[in-house]
Structures are given as C-alpha cells and as structure tokens.
Amino acid sequence: MKKLLLISLVTLFISCSTGQHPDYAKNLEITKEWFEVFVTEDFEAVSAFYADEVQYQSAFYGGPIMNREETLEYLKGWQDAMEDIAWEAENYLPGADPETGLPNGSVRTYGHWSGTNTASGKSFRGLWYHYLTFDENGKIINGGDFGDATGLVMAVAPDQE
C-alpha cells in the first residue's frame, strides 16, 4: 500500500510540473536575432520580424499599445535618434500566458542598451526589460519595452543654451 501511495504521489507531482514550451527554443533564437539586427539599424530587416497584426507596449510614460505601423515608427524613432546602438543581454527567460500562468513560448529579456544620441553626442547606458510573443510563423505578434525611456531621452538631449 505504501508503494502504491508513493507511486501515486510521484506520478501526480510529475504530471503537475510544467516543462518548457516546445516553441521556446525557436522563439529564443528569433529574439536573439532581432536584437542582432536591430543594432545594425537595418529598418527593413527589423520590420520583417513583425506580423501584420501586432500589439506592442511603448516604454514612454503614458505610452499606448501600438499596432504594427505605430510599432515600426516607434522603433525607427529609436534608430534615428541613436548611434552605435548595442544590446547587452543579462538573460533570456521563458514567458508565460498571463491568463493561465503556463509557458507559452514567449521570450523575456533583461539587459542594457547603450549608444550615443545623434543630436547631442551624449552617450547612454540603461537597464531595460523586453517581452516578445510569436505566432506559429515565428513573427512577433505582441511585445513591449520597459525602461525609463523619457528619462533616457531627457538625459541625452542637447544642452539648452
């Protein structure tokens, strides 16, 4: 009887544990590639990562959830405003479905952006968090940025005379 109880408990424990989502490894590679491409400032290549239907959260105070066109404009704004952009990831982590808490194949990452403001020549380095969710074709359908975007823009703005 004790063996049966032990086997039942082990089976229950194993069945309740969540493993890695089968798409996570593929989506992780796409995420890493996105960062590699973004820093080259090849806007057309960056645009190709996004599905036609996207919801993306801006990092600016009060920033809206953006559609594809707005998201690409937002990203182009960063590329146009900065030079020598670099991403130094601290880690990449699996994401979870917000409703179920179960792994959903999405990718989250913490790291540092650095570069130089085009207009002022001032350099920056800031800690950021990003999350990306993908469709079955490996295109980004949801994502967002968290960091002090407004503070960064103010810190590297040209000095007022």
Language model features with spans:
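Sec-dependent N-terminal signal peptides
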Residues: 6-9
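C-terminal and inter-domain tail/linker signature
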Residues: 17-161
